[in-house]
Amino acid sequence: MMGDAADGGTNTNDATEEYVFSVDGANDAPACTQCSADLHSILTCGSNPTVVQTCTGDLGCGPGGCIDACDAANASQSSIGCDYYSIPPDAWTHGSCFAAYVTNNWSSPMTVNLVWKGTTINAAPYAFIPQGTGTSITYQAIPTSGIPAGSMAIVFINQLASSDVYYVGCPASVKTAITTVDVAAKGTSIGDAVEIQTSVPAVVYDIYPYGGATSYMPSATLLLPTPAWNTNFIATTMSETPAATPGIDFVAQQDGTMITLLPTIDITAGTGVAAATANTPVTYSINKGQTVHIMQAASGTGVDLTGSIVQSNYPIGVWGEHYCLTQSASPPNWRVVGAVKGTTLTYDPPVSGAPTTLTVGQLVEFAGPGAFHVQSQDNMHPFYLAAHRPGGDCDAAHQEIPPIPTLGNEYVAIANESADYDLGGPETVNVVPPAQFLTSYIFFTDPTYGYTDLALVRVMAPDNTFKDVTLDCITGPITGWQPVGTSGKYEYVHVDVQHAGAAVGACNNGLHTISSTGLLGITVWGYDSAASYAYPAGASVKPINTVVVPPIPN
């Protein structure tokens, strides 16, 4: 499966937006101000900013000063937002429990609505706060005021009772919003996404199925808020045999959305979706909330849409997915895709067999060590990097694909800790570039998995020191950090939250917080017998390049 857009986190080392305005009309206000990354403060510009004003209540920093918090989040184009779309994968565990983890990233209670096929659903009866850890987790209804500040709730979106052998229903003690139909699109067709609306800025992940260790088909992704969507993408899926059925989804947030795709392979027609020829642009039209769901041949080679260029007239969300991802015991464990011709790559430490050059849409898979740094020549040569792990049987997959402007020109690659083929199913997860690391995260680990591993990366601070990192279940700072390569800029460590079905010290599966005064990246891995999920716990998802790759060459 795939995991993957952003957490309840902050990045105090790197303010996200600069606006020139006068605070509250004061004549002595600084000429230039900027917003803190968490949007709670107005700061002076420069490398050592000071707080000019704190935005309280439902206000956040944005153009002109303290404005509505959701408007501030929209203006920041960060991973924190108030509007998301979610889709479950087209997997053989039809109708299983589809849920979203909604983290309240603000200082006031949050209400949540779901919108599906034009109908708005108050999510309060279907939102529950997990209590406890491990197998003792219970689900508490949210307060009448909403999800508390700094907390998270699981919103149970969909389930449809099924006789499928690996069907996993939602916990018996909770209520589910949609129970009369499976919201997942089936086969190449026009479908419908579920919109998630929050009253204050949030970070949202989805997981399918929730509690899915016994399904052998889990999938999770970190969602991007719609203001962080874009009009230009390079598609990434994965071709595997014997029954991968790789696919791609496009989701619209506006009526009249036109999506032009330059496919790398032929596309077979489906319900409402026209056929297309490789290397010939094709355009699809959908309206708000609709999806173009393209699933490819079930087996063989030449069925992978990776490298296809996508451009739209309005911002869209793009997902890569797989019906049944399979993988041999000794696969390449890294996937890199180029966005610009003439891209050159350097590695620290050197990685035998890794590509040193890339062109537009080129996919290269390679094996590499547990930790390395890879970088292109500059930020006008961004590229995509994903981590992959093998596993028994097959696994469903879906991930929201980062748009081209959010791709980095450098990454720190940390492999999954487990090398046991029988532990976990095949899994792929986006690697977040250090330019989008945060300083704190709130995240939830599924209690039905016997193994949970946190892969952490920290960045040397401007004062040439590494800052302590604290996890809520560990007394004192995390220890055991190892250097990545020889540059001295990055360190990494693996932290087990659960191992072989047992707690690790005071740590166990459930709700967690982690923080530092320096920049920190975190990938959550959960795995069990023939089942895996993974997602980045967060990312700033701000635009970090100005590259545009048109599907119709100029």
Regions found by a protein language model. Give the residues of each.
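Conserved functional hotspot residues at active sites or interaction interfaces
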Residues: P30-T33, G64-N509, T513-N554
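Short, solvent-exposed secondary-structure boundary motifs
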Residues: D24-A29, P49-T54, G300, A503-V504
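Ser/Thr-rich, Pro/Gly/Ala-heavy low-complexity intrinsically disordered linkers and tails
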Residues: M1-P30
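Feature targets compositionally biased, intrinsically disordered low-complexity regions
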Residues: M2, D7-G8, D24, C45, ...
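Broad, structure-driven detector of short, well-ordered beta-strand segments within folded domains
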Residues: Y19, L59-C61, V318
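Extracellular interaction modules
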Residues: N13-A15, T54-D58
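Extracellular, cysteine-rich, disulfide-stabilized repeat modules with beta-strand cores
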Residues: T33-V51, D58-C66
